[in-house]
């Protein structure tokens, strides 16, 4: 520190040597400035300003170092958190892919089941329609047979009525009545 002060004084005094006239005179501005400067430096040294400045600079350096260490720790922690979130994002993406694949499989199975159900429903409806058609055919055939029987009975009745005598008719009626009585008992 003393060397630095001496160096500053020596450098500050160089321009004073270049002035004209006697240097050590209160009329020489350079001399007065040199004396004021030396007094100023002396006061600074007396009140230990350089050591205070160095202490403040050391404290500031320590604060900066602590801030840098804290920033490094925060950066490391942030990198760990980022890695954790990236890992979780990959896991979530994998789960989402699995869910989508499962949904596609379920949709495919549901579509196949719907096709099978539709085929079964169509087969049931076809069977029902075929049964109704067969029933309608049977009913129509029965109606045709009944009508044919009615027509045949009416024709036979008319033929018998025209060809039979009254005594034959009454004998047939009596025979029919006795047959009905025997069947009912």
UniProtKB/Swiss-Prot annotation:
Subcellular location, record wording: Cellular chromatophore membrane
Propeptide residue range(s): 1-19
Entry GO CC: plasma membrane; plasma membrane-derived chromatophore membrane; proton-transporting ATP synthase complex
InterPro entries to which the protein is assigned, alphabetical: ATP_synth_b/b'su_bac/chlpt, ATP_synthase_B_chain
Membrane topology summary: Single-pass membrane protein
Entry keyword annotation includes Transport: yes
The entry's keywords: ATP synthesis, CF(0), Hydrogen ion transport, Ion transport, Membrane, Transmembrane, Transmembrane helix, Transport
Transmembrane segments: 29-49
Family to which the UniProt record says this protein belongs: Belongs to the ATPase B chain family.
Summary of the function given for this chain in its UniProt record: F(1)F(0) ATP synthase produces ATP from ADP in the presence of a proton or sodium gradient. F-type ATPases consist of two structural domains, F(1) containing the extramembraneous catalytic core and F(0) containing the membrane proton channel, linked together by a central stalk and a peripheral stalk. During catalysis, ATP synthesis in the catalytic domain of F(1) is coupled via a rotary mechanism of the central stalk subunits to proton translocation.
HAMAP family, A to Z: ATP_synth_b_bprime
Complexes and interactors: F-type ATPases have 2 components, F(1) - the catalytic core - and F(0) - the membrane proton channel. F(1) has five subunits: alpha(3), beta(3), gamma(1), delta(1), epsilon(1). F(0) has four main subunits: a(1), b(1), b'(1) and c(10-14). The alpha and beta chains form an alternating ring which encloses part of the gamma chain. F(1) is attached to F(0) by a central stalk formed by the gamma and epsilon chains, while a peripheral stalk is formed by the delta, b and b' chains.
Protein name (database record): ATP synthase subunit b
Gene: atpF
């Amino acid at each position: 520190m003393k060397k630095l002060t001496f160096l500053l004084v020596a450098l500050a005094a160089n321009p004073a040597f270049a002035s004209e006239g006697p240097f050590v005179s209160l009329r020489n501005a350079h001399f007065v400035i040199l004396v004021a400067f030396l007094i100023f430096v002396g006061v600074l040294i007396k009140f230990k300003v350089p050591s205070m400045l160095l202490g403040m600079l050391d404290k500031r350096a320590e604060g900066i170092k602590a801030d840098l260490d804290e920033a490094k720790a925060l950066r490391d922690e942030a990198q760990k958190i980022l890695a954790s979130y990236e890992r979780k994002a990959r896991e979530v993406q994998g789960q989402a892919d699995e869910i989508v694949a499962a949904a596609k499989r379920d949709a495919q199975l549901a579509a196949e089941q719907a096709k099978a159900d539709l085929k079964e429903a169509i087969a049931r409806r076809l069977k029902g329609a075929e049964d109704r058609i067969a029933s309608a055919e049977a009913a129509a055939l029965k109606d045709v047979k009944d009508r044919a029987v009615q027509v045949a009975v009416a024709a036979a009745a008319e033929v018998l009525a025209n060809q039979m005598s009254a005594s034959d008719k009454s004998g047939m009626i009596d025979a029919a009545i006795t047959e009905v009585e025997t069947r009912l008992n």
